[in-house]
Amino acid sequence: MRFRIRKCPSCGRYTLKETCPVCGTKTKIAHPPRFSPEDPYGEYRRRLKREQLGIVKR
């Protein structure tokens, strides 16, 4: 069994549980995804980020 530290997005506390023991919000894994030079979804992720920030690609 492998434990990953998790972080509550609302209060910012770290825990190993699925829900925050302080506020009850669902926690998220605090680690970034693994890096891969052959990133199969990189193009889509960058496009989504540009759309969210309102950047127009020229």
UniProtKB/Swiss-Prot annotation:
One of its GO terms (biological process) is rRNA processing. GO terms for cellular component: ribonucleoprotein complex. The keyword Protein transport does not apply. Keywords: Ribonucleoprotein, Ribosome biogenesis, rRNA processing. InterPro entries: H/ACA_rnp_Nop10, H/ACA_rnp_Nop10_sf, Nop10_arc-typ. Pfam families: Nop10p (PF04135). GO terms for molecular function: snoRNA binding. Gene3D superfamilies: H/ACA ribonucleoprotein complex, subunit Nop10 (2.20.28.40). Involved in ribosome biogenesis; more specifically in 18S rRNA pseudouridylation and in cleavage of pre-rRNA. Belongs to the NOP10 family. HAMAP family: Nop10. This is Ribosome biogenesis protein Nop10. The lineage of its organism: Archaea, Methanobacteriati, Methanobacteriota, Thermococci, Thermococcales.
